[in-house]
Structures are given as structure tokens and as C-alpha cells.
Swiss-Prot record:
Spider venom toxin that shows calcium channel blocking activity and exhibits cytolytic activity by affecting the outer leaflet curvature and/or pore formation across the membrane. It blocks L-type calcium channels (Cav1/CACNA1) in mammalian neurons at nanomolar concentrations. Furthermore, it produces a slow voltage-independent block of mid/low and high voltage-activated calcium channels in cockroach neurons. Potassium ions, histamine, M-ctenitoxin-Cs1a (AC P83619), CSTX-9 (AC P58604), and CSTX-13 (AC P83919) synergistically increase the insecticidal activity of this toxin. Signal peptide: none annotated. Belongs to the neurotoxin 19 (CSTX) family. Its main location: secreted. The presence of a 'disulfide through disulfide knot' structurally defines this protein as a knottin. It is found in: Secreted; Target cell membrane. Expressed by the venom gland. The keyword Secreted applies. Disulfide bonds join C6-C21, C13-C30, C20-C47, C32-C45. Keywords: Amidation, Calcium channel impairing toxin, Cytolysis, Disulfide bond, Ion channel impairing toxin, Knottin, Membrane, Neurotoxin, Secreted, Target cell membrane, Target membrane, Toxin, Voltage-gated calcium channel impairing toxin. This is Toxin CSTX-11.
Length: 69
């Protein structure tokens, strides 16, 4: 999807799991969680940066800083 119609980071993507926006390097992924509210259990999803993507972004950032000079 284009930038204007994608779902931003930390926004709900329960009904449209393939529409997360692109982050710095990678597209956010729709991650789902079980929410228990009283006796009712529902599934809620949000666009997030997975841990391995965060680590890759950090490595690229460190690499750029090392070779900036």
C-alpha cells in the first residue's frame, strides 16, 4: 500500500494485517496479542518493529557512525 493509506507504528492492524507502513529500513509487522477483559478474550493486533529488525537497524546505525569520518 502507499504511504498515505498504510497503518502507522503502534496503530491497530487487526482487520488489515498486511497494511503496516515502512519504518527506517523495514516494513513494520502486524503483531497480535490476546487481550483478556473480564471474562472475554479478544485478539488485538498492532504494527510494530520486530526485535530482529530493531537489532539490524541498530547495527546499521553503528556501522554508519564508524565510517562517517
Amino acid at each position: 500500500k502507499d504511504k498515505e493509506n498504510c497503518i502507522g507504528k503502534h496503530h491497530e492492524c487487526t482487520d488489515d494485517r498486511d497494511s503496516c507502513c515502512k519504518g527506517k529500513l523495514f516494513r513494520y509487522q502486524c503483531q497480535c496479542f490476546k487481550v483478556i477483559d473480564g471474562k472475554k478474550e479478544t485478539k488485538r493486533c498492532a504494527c510494530v518493529t520486530p526485535l530482529h529488525y530493531k537489532m539490524a537497524e541498530m547495527a546499521v546505525s553503528v556501522f554508519k557512525k564508524m565510517f562517517k569520518n
